[in-house]
């Protein structure tokens, strides 16, 4: 009887470990990239204004493409529209098609003077060191892949962890 209980307990532990590993990999493996390229340097995510509005799909992904447009936002972010390279075309959705000309939204946070009063506290004690791209720059970005629930659930990388102009 004691051996049976031990065997059952061991089996339960093995199943729980396997399930935990599967969950961890599914939540943390970026699309099109390995985890070595994707991390949150300096806890950038802790400086996102009203993070509750973002539904995290993947904790970190990599994507590349050409910058279509760059907008200043009142919350201090740069809103970058990225025309994705074909291998990343699955990252956009119908809301991106309808409101963002089919582009992925890429948000570089706390990079501008903040003119929206309730956003000021999010950027306190954080200095953004990410280079801001120009229109027509080819870039590679990493960061959380999210849906913005306050903007029709369009897809974004928000915040950008790294941005390389290539």
Q: Where do the language-model regions lie?
A:
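OB-fold and OB-like single-stranded nucleic-acid-recognition modules
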Residues: 2-9, 16-166
């Amino acid at each position: 009887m004691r051996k049976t209980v031990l065997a059952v307990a061991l089996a339960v532990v093995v199943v729980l470990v396997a399930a935990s590993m599967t969950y961890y990999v599914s939540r943390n493996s970026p699309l099109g990239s390995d985890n070595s390229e994707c991390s949150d340097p300096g806890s950038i995510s802790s400086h996102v204004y009203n993070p509750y509005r973002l539904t995290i799909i993947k904790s970190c992904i990599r994507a590349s493409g050409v910058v279509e447009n760059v907008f200043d936002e009142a919350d201090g972010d740069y809103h970058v529209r990225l025309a994705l390279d074909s291998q990343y075309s699955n990252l956009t959705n119908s809301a991106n098609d309808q409101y963002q000309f089919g582009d992925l939204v890429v948000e570089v946070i706390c990079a501008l003077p903040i003119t929206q009063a309730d956003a000021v506290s999010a950027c306190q004690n954080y200095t953004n060191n990410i280079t801001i791209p120009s229109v027509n720059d080819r870039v590679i970005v990493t960061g959380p892949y999210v849906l913005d629930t306050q903007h029709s659930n369009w897809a974004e990388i928000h915040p950008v962890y790294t941005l390389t102009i290539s």
